[in-house]
Amino acid sequence: MRALYPGSFDPLTLGHLDLIERGCALFGEVVVAVLSNPAKTPAFTLQQRFNQIHVATAHCKGVSVISFDGLTVRCARHNQVDLILRGLRAMSDFEYELQIAHTNRSLAPDFETIFLATAAHHSFLSSSMVKEVARFGGNIDHMVPEVVAQDLHRLFN
């Protein structure tokens, strides 16, 4: 099976990486779909995020990285995946993700969204939080893959 894992990944966290690894173990292949949203100004370019994901997932068989804009279900159909993979950190994530899953299902009834609970030790992580800690010189080594930590240190120093 092929799973689509969409997100901005700005930056990739260890929580994201854990989901990618678990997705590969469960489904065999994970297509990491990096959102290119012209309405947002990301900390890292699309190419930088691609590189971060490629380096961080080099040990994983079955990972591919693509970019997309627009609807997730269009991306899923275009890339011939079987399901959409999402992670849940807390109940607030569940409510938000369930609404998106229902919307996706209304647009493409043949696509399922599978939720995986985030590992407890990653449940506090968010890309926004990581950037904030890095911006103020805090230790982020336990939050992101090494390649991302290096890029964040360069960005904020």
UniProtKB/Swiss-Prot annotation:
Keywords: ATP-binding, Coenzyme A biosynthesis, Cytoplasm, Magnesium, Nucleotide-binding, Nucleotidyltransferase, Transferase. The keyword Nucleotidyltransferase applies. GO terms for molecular function: ATP binding; pantetheine-phosphate adenylyltransferase activity. One of its GO terms (biological process) is coenzyme A biosynthetic process. The record marks H16 as: Transition state stabilizer. It is found in: Cytoplasm. SUPFAM superfamilies: Nucleotidylyl transferase. ATP binds at S8, F9, H16, G87, L88, R89, E97, H122, S123, F124, L125, S126, S127, S128. InterPro entries: Cyt_trans-like, PPAT, Rossmann-like_a/b/a_fold. The keyword Metal-binding does not apply. Substrate binds at S8, K40, T72, R86. Pathway: Cofactor biosynthesis; coenzyme A biosynthesis; CoA from (R)-pantothenate: step 4/5. Its cofactor is Mg(2+). Belongs to the bacterial CoaD family. PANTHER family: PHOSPHOPANTETHEINE ADENYLYLTRANSFERASE. This is Phosphopantetheine adenylyltransferase. It comes from Prochlorococcus marinus (strain MIT 9303). The gene is coaD.
